[in-house]
């Protein structure tokens, strides 16, 4: 197990997979992994969906008690992909830059004032200007007051 501390306090203990995929706090999400977890200011709008700018993202988190409240949606860059034929959980983005890092490409995109990072397969064709990114519901982490719901 790994223990993550902040300001002398244990904030999470768990396996590397647990810390990476389900960080208990936004601090752990930011601290573990490279690049850091994408964290988006959003609003809980239904039992399990959030709104980021004008995009609706469905999650597997019960948000009933937080409806119409501000939350943060966290997702790792490894889980964000360029959309194929998915119809839901899409972000319309402007491609900012693509870095070829050998075994993968790091896509940096903008959606309004948000910056989104995605690690994509090195063989994937990346659109030069606009793209749709898919956010899988099962990989979303939703935070309220910086803590995982």
Where do the protein language model's features map onto the residues?
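A small-molecule sensor/coupling module
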Residues: 32
């Amino acid at each position: 197990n790994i223990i993550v501390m902040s300001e002398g306090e244990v904030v999470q203990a768990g396996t590397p997979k647990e810390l990476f995929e389900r960080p208990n706090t936004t601090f752990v999400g930011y601290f573990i992994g490279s690049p850091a977890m994408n964290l988006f200011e959003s609003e809980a709008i239904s039992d399990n969906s959030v709104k980021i700018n004008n995009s609706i993202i469905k999650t597997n988190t019960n948000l009933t008690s937080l409806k119409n409240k501000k939350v943060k949606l966290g997702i790792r860059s490894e889980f964000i992909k360029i959309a194929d034929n998915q119809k839901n959980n899409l972000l319309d983005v402007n491609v900012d830059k693509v870095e070829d890092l050998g075994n993968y490409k790091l896509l940096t995109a903008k959606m309004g004032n948000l910056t989104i990072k995605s690690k994509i397969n090195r063989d994937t064709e990346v659109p030069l200007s606009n793209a749709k990114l898919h956010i899988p519901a099962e990989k979303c982490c939703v935070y309220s007051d910086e803590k995982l719901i």
